[in-house]
Every structure is written in structure tokens, then in C-alpha cells.
Amino acid sequence: LGDVKLEMKSSDGYNSITIDRVEAIFHDNPSSEDYYSVKLRLLNREMNRDLGLLTDNEPLLNKKSKLDDDFGMDDYEYFGNAYIFNDRTINGKTYTLHLDTYSYSYRQSFYIFSYVVDLYKVTPEYYRFLKSINDAQSNSWADVGLMQVTPTYSNVKGGFGVVAGYNISSVSKFF
């Protein structure tokens, strides 16, 4: 995981909401099919908490389809704010993740704070498990009876659960 930058921007000219964009640069290994999870955390002397991301401006994380939008279905939800993606579209490239969140920088102006980016390289099994949970909790079509509920992935024979693992790389920057 490379450099991390912070950019503050207003969501539009008529809205007072400020968005913080944290950009995190990483390089994907071209010789393997890789699966990732990314988390953004806010850290100061009083708290260490996972933040929800606004995924509209990050193609690797935006799972909402035009059909979902047209019918007013909810946004795709990520279990535990663990935003998962694979390397199919970025294989072997250096990529900049655009992690947008509602601004905490103006609230933290009295404290030194940092955004911490945790990039996890996860096993295919862990990715499938998280994806199945995300798909199940984000399936608005099943909620209204128009689609079948998807089962949760398990690789345990004769039981439930998953045997999987991950490797983490973290970088933080104080602001």
C-alpha cells in the first residue's frame, strides 16, 4: 500500500455536506487472481472507528446497477464496512482507490486525527463468504419477492461457516 492523500470537497453547490476523499494507491500482482477488502478508519485520541464509504465514485466498490437505481432499490451494503473487490479490471496495475466518506475533518479540527486505510488481501474462500453475506443483505429484489434469496457460502463439509484467511497492509496519515 502506497501513499494516502486527503481531499475535501463539497457534494454540490447547494448542499452544505462535505465529503472527504481519501486516495490510497496500491499495486496488484499480475501473476495471480487476487481478492481484496478495504476499510477506512478514523483515529484520534478519543476514538478508533470504521467508517462507511460512499461508493458512487469508485468503480471497484460501486455495485449498484442502473436497474436498481431506476426502481429505487437500496444501495449495496458491505458487511462490517469491509468493502470487497477483485482484481479482474485492474490486474497487474497500480491503482488509486477513491474512498469517499462524509467529512470528519471539520469535526476533528480541534484534534489531530488520521484516516487509516486497511487493505486486506483475502483468500478466495473469504471473498466468497463476504460476497454471499453482502449479496444476501443487499438483495432488495428478494425483499419484495421478485428474486430468490442467495445462500451464504460455506466451505465446511457437514456444517456451516468458512475456513479462510487474510493478510493486511495498513497506512495512515495525520491531518
Which residues make up each language-model segment?
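A sequence/structural signal for flexible, mid-protein segments enriched
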Residues: 1-175
